[in-house]
Curated annotation (Swiss-Prot):
Active site as annotated: 120, 138
GO CC terms in record: plasma membrane
Membrane topology qualifier: Multi-pass membrane protein
Pathway(s) of this molecule: Protein modification; lipoprotein biosynthesis (signal peptide cleavage)
GO molecular function, one term: aspartic-type endopeptidase activity
Role this protein plays: This protein specifically catalyzes the removal of signal peptides from prolipoproteins.
UniProtKB keywords: Aspartyl protease, Cell inner membrane, Cell membrane, Hydrolase, Membrane, Protease, Transmembrane, Transmembrane helix
Location in the cell: Cell inner membrane
Protein name: Lipoprotein signal peptidase
Enzyme Commission (EC) number: 3.4.23.36
Amino acid sequence: MKRKYYWIYINIIFFIITVDFYSKKWILNHLNIYEKQKVFFILNLFHVHNFGAAFSILSDQNGWQKYFLLIFSIIIILAIIKIMIKFKKKDKNKILSYSLILAGAIGNLIDRINYGFVIDFIDLHFKSWHFATFNIADFSIFIGMIMIIKKNYYNS
């Protein structure tokens, strides 16, 4: 990836990290832990602390996962950066998808460093069925992964 094109993706990454950071800050300042605030019929704000990974995997462990996930996150972030440096300018969708994943990984890493857990608050639901509670960083990672899967599916 040429240096002059870095700034576009760096701005996207910083924007997502900033929105993620301040949305979590707002939740911390306005909702108590486990407090729920209805936004509209399929969306609640629900303040939870995730001590594990995606879908609360490992959250029931006795604390070792905190250090494991911290180190794992750093390794993933460094690997993504290394991969992105090798991209060519024409790989715009790839660069964007990895930028979204990188931004989400950094956003959640900031939480792990600051609090020892990740702040989740987006509760999508239909009647009594609730999807796993997530945050902006998680959503960014999800969209980036969908883009990669879609690109790989249609190129195979």
